[in-house]
C-alpha cells in the first residue's frame, strides 16, 4: 500500500503559505504504517492538477488531495477529480442544509459557487466538515482510493482526525482505535518546546508527538492507538503528563478549535467575573478578539481605545500632567490605564496596552516595546514590559495574546 499527497493551491506553490497540512498528513500515514514516497504541490489549474492525479495513480493506490474545495473560482479540486473519474457532482443534503443556514444567518444570497461546497463526486462516502462548509470525500474507484480534504488547517485537521483516520486504519489493516489530544501553548517558541521534549520525540512510538506553530502559539498533538478508545486514552495520559511537567507553565488549553480568547471567556464564566480593557497601540484588537467568542457579552460589557495622551486623560480620567511626566510608554501609564478602566467599567479585572508598535521609536523607546497593565478588584495594579520582535502587526498581535495569557493566569491563580 502506498499513498501520495497532492497539496492544491497556487499560494503554496508560490511560497506564500507553508504546506503544514502535507506534513501533518504524512505523520498520520507513518503512524498507520502506510508508505508515502511522494508528495506533489500543484497550483489552482485543472489540467495540471489532472496530470498530478495521473502521476500519483501510476505509483500509488491512495491519492490524498488537500485544498481547492471552497467556493472561489480557483477552487477546482473536486470538479477536476470528478471529471477525471467520469463522475458527476451530487449534493449532500446535510451539508446543503448547513450551508443554507449559514447563508440565511449572514443575510446574503445563495450563489452557485457557494453550493459547490456541499457537493461531492457521485458514489463517494462523505467526510463531514465539523468546522467549515466544504464536504470532504472518500472515493473508491477500481484499484485506487481518493480522498478530498479542505485546505484551511482548522477544517483539515478535525476532518483528518475524526473522519479520515478511522477509515485509513481499516483500509491499511490497522484495526486499533486512534485517539488524539491537542495541547496548546503560548509564550514559548516551537524550537524551545521541541528542545524541552527532545527525548520524548526521539523515542516516540505509540503515542506519537507532533508539534505545529501558527500565529505565535505552539500546538502539540499527542496520538495513541489501542483496542478501545479507553485503552488509547490510557496510553495518552503518561505522555501528556510528561509534556506538562516540562512546559506546563506555557499551556493554556486543549482542543483543535480553541484559542486564548475562548479560554479567557470560559474562565471568566467559571469565576462569574467581568473584564474590561484600555488599549493604545493595540487599537481595540484585544476587545475585538473577546468579541469573537460567543456568549462573551455576559462577561465583557465594553472598554476603551485611547490612542493619544489626550484621550487617555479624557476617557480614563487620568491626570494629563502625570501622563506627560511619566510618558505614554511607561509602567505608570499601563497601571493607570488598567485601574481607571476597571473602575469606570465596574469590572473585576482589566488589561491595558501601551507601547511602540513601530516602525518608528517613541519617547526614545524602540519599536516592539510594550507595557501591559493588569488591574484586579481589591489588588494593586501591576505592569509588565515586553520587547516583541517583528513588524507592526506582529507586535500588536503578540501584545494582545500576551495580555490574554496574563489575564487568564490571574484568574486561575
UniProtKB/Swiss-Prot annotation:
Pfam families: CinA (PF02464), CinA_KH (PF18146), MoCF_biosynth (PF00994)
Entry-linked InterPro entries: CinA, CinA-like_C, CinA_C, CinA_KH, Competence-induced_CinA, MoaB/Mog-like_dom_sf, MoaB/Mog_dom
CDD domains from the UniProt entry: cinA (cd00885)
Family of the protein in this entry: Belongs to the CinA family.
Protein name, per record: Putative competence-damage inducible protein
Lineage, broadest ranks: Bacteria, Bacillati, Bacillota, Bacilli, Lactobacillales
Gene: cinA
